[in-house]
Amino acid sequence: MRIDLQKVAEKLLLVLFLSSSLFFVLEIALRAYSYELAGMIIFTAMFCAGMVALAFVSAKLEKTVSIPVAALLIFFLYAASVSMFFNSIVLSLFLLSFPFAWLRFVEKKTFNESLQLLMATRKGFLWNALLGFCLTLFLFYPIMFLEVVILKLVGITDVSNVSEIIRKAPLWLAVFSFTVAPVAEEFFFRGFLLPRIGIVASAVLFGLAHYAYSSVAEFLGAFTIGLLLGILLLRTRNIVSVIVAHITFNLISILIIYLGSWFG
């Protein structure tokens, strides 16, 4: 029996979108629960909304989607209770799947049309991958290094916040940050947002998304790399180039941090 890989990918992305969305609804509800009466009301409302949404999914979609959604949601909730870092994983899965869900349900696009709109194509794959790797290694990273030097000269030195968080994080999160996370972020910020709100606005949002480290240097760094990746995507019209560039950038950064902690 021949397996339709596009159908499998489409269903997998739908499962990821629904389960990650429901996870954050319930996560916010649980956080609100601690805020006395108002929090309990919000918790009840959001919990009920999440359960209604899950029931809707079960009723409207076939079992090949609804059952995995419920199972994955339970796993997400359990994993998040075990590790405080797991929310980052679910967020990346949401960012990856959201563009496809939006294009399917709001803009009524087929999966192939969605891939084209997100500039995901196999044409020139190796060339774009090599371009993204080389540009990051010989242009983007030197630019970012120069930016860090300038920031230190003007008194912005909180870049160490990021290094400390990464050192304390489990190894699997570091691996995730240069494998899955760059793919998710490029599909969302460059493939989906950039054509809709422009290169500068998408770079600002990309920077704000990295401000969770409470680091001005990290925000400015993410904003700059967001601009560089945006320019690269507009030139190549192929998301492979920016995904590989982002993977390369994150991998180099993590290696520098770990090598610094081992030999520093």
Task: List each model region and its residues.
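Non-cytosolic membrane-interface motifs at loop->transmembrane helix junctions
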Residues: 36-41, 89-94, 158-164, 219-227
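Alpha-helical transmembrane segments of multipass membrane proteins
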Residues: 19-27, 47-51, 77-78, 95, ...
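Membrane-water interface at transmembrane helix exits
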Residues: 26, 30, 58-59, 81-82, ...
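Juxtamembrane helix-loop-helix connectors linking adjacent transmembrane helices
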Residues: 30-38, 110-181, 263-264
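Alpha-helical transmembrane segments in multi-pass membrane proteins
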Residues: 31-109
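Interfacial transmembrane-helix boundary/kink motif in multi-pass membrane proteins
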Residues: 2-17, 37-42, 60-77, 109-142
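Residue-level signature of transmembrane alpha-helical entry/exit and packing/kink sites
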Residues: 11-12, 40, 67-68, 92, ...
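Transmembrane helix-loop-helix hairpins at the membrane interface
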Residues: 19-29, 45, 163-264
